[in-house]
């Protein structure tokens, strides 16, 4: 039988302390404090041994001990340490630990830090579990918390990320609402005004993907009313050419507009995907040969 590692020995010592009845002269709090300290030591030892699941479990036990002592700040930090360990291959457990962290942060009024952790959850959903719908929800929550803390630029990035994902999920009305929201905020600053044309282009592409050319044209005019320089941009001219081609059911004109735009501004994966969807919609129109 292999000898116990130092980390395992510490973990068992912590378990023994947590399960003890305590002595005549010791308080319940001191028992949980000592057990929490031992779990923390065990967790760090597991990390040195690169046993990240075990490290996360030990940090989670530490967090529970801190909670029993009503030490919310320390409990939140322990849950976050658990999440960082779980992120090394255990995304579902990492999400659960981050959610616990957020509860403590919100209870303490630390919404900026709560937003940071919620954004981490969104990225795990996106990159590890590939659950785009839940990633959208987490990006939105993070964005709302950032907005409440006047971190407008970071909030807008979260809303934009959510909009991109909603479009991938073909939930275009939600995407349009968010792109317009980010554009409205961006118009208020000279530092971010330049990016507005990109948000409006994406919004128009989503509207065209819905097959609603009338609303797309109405929205384009609304955007020009908000910033009359938009009409002279490549983004507007591209969207306008696409609307004309889709309205006419002209696949050739549509393809030519896409090729011309891509020649100067390389299409990213998001635009390529939605443009292919729109093209398929033209080809599937009844009576089109």
UniProtKB/Swiss-Prot annotation:
It is a peripheral membrane protein. This is Vesicular-fusion protein SEC17. Belongs to the SNAP family. SUPFAM superfamilies: TPR-like (SSF48452). It is found in: Membrane. Required for vesicular transport between the endoplasmic reticulum and the Golgi apparatus. GO terms for biological process: intracellular protein transport; SNARE complex disassembly. Keywords: ER-Golgi transport, Membrane, Protein transport, Transport. InterPro entries: NSF_attach, TPR-like_helical_dom_sf. One of its GO terms (molecular function) is syntaxin binding. One of its GO terms (cellular component) is vacuolar membrane. Its main location: membrane.
């Amino acid at each position: 039988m292999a000898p116990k590692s130092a980390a395992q020995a510490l973990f068992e010592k912590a378990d023994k302390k947590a399960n003890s009845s305590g002595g005549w002269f010791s308080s319940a709090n001191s028992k949980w404090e000592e057990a929490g300290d031992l779990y923390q030591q065990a967790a760090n030892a597991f990390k040195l041994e690169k046993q990240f699941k075990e490290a996360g479990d030990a940090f989670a036990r530490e967090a529970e001990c801190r909670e029993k002592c009503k030490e919310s700040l320390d409990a939140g930090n322990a849950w976050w340490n658990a999440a960082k360990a779980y992120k090394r291959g255990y995304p579902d457990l990492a999400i659960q630990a981050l959610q616990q962290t957020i509860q403590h942060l919100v209870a303490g009024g630390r919404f900026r830090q709560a937003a940071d952790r919620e954004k981490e959850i969104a990225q795990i959903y996106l990159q590890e579990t590939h659950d785009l719908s839940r990633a959208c929800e987490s990006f939105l929550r993070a964005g709302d918390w950032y907005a409440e803390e006047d971190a407008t630029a970071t909030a807008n990035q979260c809303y934009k990320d959510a909009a991109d994902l909603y479009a991938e999920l073909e939930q275009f009305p939600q995407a349009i609402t968010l792109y317009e929201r980010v554009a409205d905020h961006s118009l208020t600053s000279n530092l971010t005004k330049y990016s507005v044309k990109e948000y409006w282009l994406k919004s128009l592409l989503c509207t065209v993907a819905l097959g609603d050319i009338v609303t797309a044209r109405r929205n384009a005019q609304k955007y020009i009313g908000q910033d009359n320089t938009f009409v002279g941009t490549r983004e507007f001219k591209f969207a306008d050419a696409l609307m004309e081609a889709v309205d006419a059911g002209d696949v050739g004109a549509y393809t030519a507009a896409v090729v011309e735009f891509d020649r100067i501004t390389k299409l990213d994966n998001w635009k390529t995907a939605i443009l292919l969807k729109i093209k398929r919609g033209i080809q599937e129109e009844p009576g089109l040969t």
